[in-house]
């Protein structure tokens, strides 16, 4: 029996850019859909990591003991806004569960506390976000700009975010697996 493609646009879905999407930051991006409603959608890019130097006034990097912190470009909108994706379920009043064991939210004191803990939770510190107006994401999906997959802790906090796009396509199997081998520069094909 053939696998039925995942086709549900909802919180906890992963959006994978079609290989022919050549839209700068969205090229080969994997986006965790954090909210999807009739009013619009927003998500965070998981596979575009950043090498950042952050002011000690904002985040005292010298006190970071948790090696599980990754800096990501969440998207092109409001790039100065910081959002936390993490695996800490202990502060439910400040966070929203996006998929099992993956949470969005928390404040600066929470971040500083878990960053100084050697055995802290997994954290994606995302700068900016990706957003769509009402109906826009649905149109892009129907136009073939995005493929969908269910999100998981393993995908969100993978050790190799640079390979996440092709890893998920391979896991989806079938035609998606063959798309995972398409070169970034289609002229090289």
From Swiss-Prot:
Family recorded in the similarity comment: Belongs to the UPF0301 (AlgH) family.
Protein name: UPF0301 protein CAB604
Signal peptide start-end: none
GO cellular component terms listed in the entry, alphabetical order: cytosol
């Amino acid at each position: 029996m053939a696998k039925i493609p995942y086709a549900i646009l909802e919180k906890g879905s992963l959006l994978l850019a079609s290989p022919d999407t050549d839209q700068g930051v969205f090229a080969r991006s994997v986006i965790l859909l954090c909210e999807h409603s009739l009013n619009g959608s927003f998500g965070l890019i998981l596979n575009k990591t950043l090498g950042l130097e952050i002011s000690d006034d904002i985040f005292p990097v010298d006190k970071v003991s948790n090696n599980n912190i990754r800096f990501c470009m969440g998207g092109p909108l409001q790039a100065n806004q910081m959002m936390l994706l993490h695996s800490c379920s202990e502060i439910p009043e400040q966070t929203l569960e996006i998929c099992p064991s993956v949470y969005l939210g928390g404040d600066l004191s929470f971040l500083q506390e878990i960053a100084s803990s050697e055995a802290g939770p997994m954290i994606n510190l995302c700068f900016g976000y990706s957003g769509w107006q009402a109906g826009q994401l649905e149109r892009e999906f129907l136009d073939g700009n995005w493929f969908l997959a269910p999100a998981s802790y393993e995908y969100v906090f993978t050790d190799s975010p640079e390979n996440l796009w092709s890893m998920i396509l391979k896991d989806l199997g079938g035609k998606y697996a063959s798309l995972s081998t398409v070169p970034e520069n289609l002229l090289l094909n």
